[in-house]
Amino acid sequence: MAIERTFSIIKPDAVAKNHIGAIYNRFETAGLKIVAAKMLHLTKEQAEGFYAEHSERGFFGALVAFMTSGPIMVQVLEGENAVLAHREILGATNPAQAAPGTIRADFAQSIDENAAHGSDSLASAEREIAYFFSAEELCPRTR
């Protein structure tokens, strides 16, 4: 098993419903350590930059509008096979298809407002972490 880091967002819908603590509890209960975290209210430019890979897709404008509609939590999680572990905790992108007990099944209302984002690969995690955090902001958890 490999110790990895992954990137996570708690989206505006889940922040507005005060689910931050419950979601953090899910991460930690699953063995993922939070090594960096901050609350942000994304600008349009930040959201467009982060989601640039989707800029030609029909849902891009709605995605940017949603992600700038309120505060978000961004965090870096660390643990064994963190990318896969985090995605399993999140559940399917569409909460209607998410397994019971996953974050999206429990806290999301729709595929558009689906509570959370997680990196889909180590390469994505590295890029997404660097978008929001400097190396100095990452705090190794040795205890």
From Swiss-Prot:
The keyword Translocase does not apply. The active site is at H117. Keywords: ATP-binding, Cytoplasm, Kinase, Magnesium, Metal-binding, Nucleotide metabolism, Nucleotide-binding, Phosphoprotein, Transferase. Its main location: cytoplasm. The lineage of its organism: Bacteria, Pseudomonadati, Pseudomonadota, Gammaproteobacteria, Alteromonadales. CDD domains: NDPk_I (cd04413). Belongs to the NDK family. Its EC number is 2.7.4.6. Homotetramer. Its cofactor is Mg(2+). It catalyses: a 2'-deoxyribonucleoside 5'-diphosphate + ATP = a 2'-deoxyribonucleoside 5'-triphosphate + ADP; a ribonucleoside 5'-diphosphate + ATP = a ribonucleoside 5'-triphosphate + ADP. This is Nucleoside diphosphate kinase.
